Amino acid sequence: MRSLSLFTALLAGQAFAYPKPVLQSSTRRDWPTINEFLTELAEIMPIGDTVSAACDLIGDAEDVAADLFDISNTENDACGDVTVLFARGTCDPGNVGVLVGPWFFNSLETALPNKKVGVKGVPYPASVQGFLSGSVQPGIDMANQIKSVISSCPNTKLVLGGYSQGSMVVHNAASNLDAATMAKVSAVVLFGDPYDGRPVANYDASKVLVVCHDGDNICQGGDFILLPHLTYAEDADTAAAFVKPLVS
């Protein structure tokens, strides 16, 4: 269920100096529902400003939400039956962020109860400059990480995932690998992809899911953080359902 009404008051789109975010309710809770999560984020997330202007607040807000709901923003698991390499978005904390990655992993574990799911974050800077310049070197580094996982864990079902700038990184990684290597990847899932509409290089398009919300300026090649770019947690179950038959 969409939660757009939760953010109505935040859609003015005016740039301003952001204070460090503080949630009104700070008692640590169990893993939230989507609506609970988005309601809390509505208090603290920047909407209507550029990535450059909002970067610090994005990281601070995700740190607050991660602490409130005990959500891990860093994953360095061993390979599982299914292994997810995930590249977080610009300014997201840890190596998988909070807004999208953990929700996707949780949904995938629920969809695959009889399989061990291992998650590895892609260790790249996720900086504003990286986003603006196309995140080329992180793509090369992720390509090497993909080759390492394939070599060390030949029996795992490998899933590549990315959010926002992380989707750029996945695109660039695929461009640095040949088709024979990419054929060993079971699925690719991209959320809020700045390169929406471009194919993932050297890979079967039927195994790619790109989720871009209507009105997401990042998916349109822009650099404004609007409401639709912050709500991809809503699509975690859909993404997991897409991946499930490809790794079963």
Swiss-Prot record:
Catalytic activity annotated for this protein?
cutin + H2O = cutin monomers
Annotated active site residues, numbered on this chain, are S164, D216, H229
- Where does it reside? Secreted
What GO terms in the biological process aspect are recorded for it? carbohydrate catabolic process
Q: Report whether Hydrolase shows up as a keyword of the record.
A: yes
Query: Which N-terminal residues, if any, form the signal peptide?
Result: 1-17
EC number(s) on file: 3.1.1.74
Q: Where is this site: Transition state stabilizer?
A: T90, Q165
What is the disulfide pattern of this chain? C79-C153, C212-C219
What Gene3D superfamilies does this protein map onto?
alpha/beta hydrolase
InterPro entries reported in the protein's UniProt record: AB_hydrolase_fold, Cutinase/axe, CUTINASE_1, CUTINASE_2, Cutinase_monf
PTM details? The 2 disulfide bonds play a critical role in holding the catalytic residues in juxta-position; reduction of the disulfide bridges results in the complete inactivation of the enzyme.
One GO cellular component, as annotated: extracellular region
UniProt-listed Pfam families: Cutinase
**Is Ligase found in the keyword set?**
no
Question: Induction: what does the entry report?
Answer: Induced during growth on olive oil. Induced during growth on the lipidic carbon source 16-hydroxyhexadecanoic acid (synthetic cutin monomer). Induced during growth on plant material. Induced during growth on pectin. Repressed during growth on glucose carbon source.
What molecular functions are annotated in GO for this chain? cutinase activity
* EC top class, as a word: hydrolase
Q: How does activity depend on pH?
A: Optimum pH is 7.5-8.
Write out the entry's keywords from A to Z: Disulfide bond, Hydrolase, Secreted, Serine esterase, Signal
Q: Which family does it belong to?
A: Belongs to the cutinase family.
Primary role:
Catalyzes the hydrolysis of complex carboxylic polyesters found in the cell wall of plants. May degrade cutin, a macromolecule that forms the structure of the plant cuticle. May also degrade suberin, a specialized macromolecule found in the cell wall of various plant tissues.
According to UniProt, the name of this protein is: Cutinase cut1
Its organism's taxonomic lineage begins at:
Eukaryota, Fungi, Dikarya, Ascomycota, Pezizomycotina
